[in-house]
Amino acid sequence: MNTLLDCFCGMGGVSDGFALEGFDVTGIDIVDAQVKLDYKHKFIQADMLMLKGEDFRGYDVIWGSPPCTDFSTASCPNKTRKGRKAPDPERGLELIRAFRKFVDDANPKFWLMENVPRTTKFYTMEKPILSFWIGKYAKRVLWGNVAFPLISEFRFSQVLEKDYQKFKWRKQSALKAKIPLACSRAFARACKQALEVK
C-alpha cells in the first residue's frame, strides 16, 4: 500500500483525499481542539520545527501545507483581529524551510507543498510546479517533484468548482482550512501514477 505523511495536516482535507485513493495516511500537526475532533487518520502531535526527517524515512509521498497566514492578503494588518498576530513572512518562511529540510532528510519518493500565491514573493528557492484555483475565489500554488504532466491532466477548474460548492463556507469558517476532496484526490491519483512509473 502507498503511504502518505501529511505535514501540517490540520483537519485532514489532504489526508482524506489520499485515503480515499488507497493511501495509508499519517498526519502531523501541533494540534488544537478542532484538529483532534476532525482528524480521522493516524496522527502524530508534534511541532515540525522539532522533528527530524531521518525518523520518517520510508514514506512514498510527503505533503506539506504550512500555515498561509503569514503570506495571505487575508491576514493583512488592516484586517488583523484583536489577539491575532500580524503577518510575518519570515515566521512563515521558517516553517517552509523546516519542512523542506525535513523532506530532504526523510527522502520520500515524492513530495508536494501547497500554499497561497503570495508565498512565491518570499520563498524563491524553488519554482512552483503548478498553480490552481479552488473554486472561483481561492488560488493555491504547488511545489514538488511529481512530474507536472501527471498533475496537469486533471481538470481542476471543473472538478473543484463542484466540490467547492458542497461546503457551507460562510457558516462553518473552520472548513476554509480544508482542501476540497476533489482536489486532494486528484493529487493522490497523480502521485499513484507517478509511483507506478518510478
Model-derived features: where do they sit?
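Phosphate-coordination loops involved in phosphoryl transfer and adenosine-cofactor binding
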Residues: 1
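SAM cofactor-binding core of SAM-dependent methyltransferases
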Residues: 4-52
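Class I S-adenosyl-L-methionine
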Residues: 7, 43, 51-61, 68-198
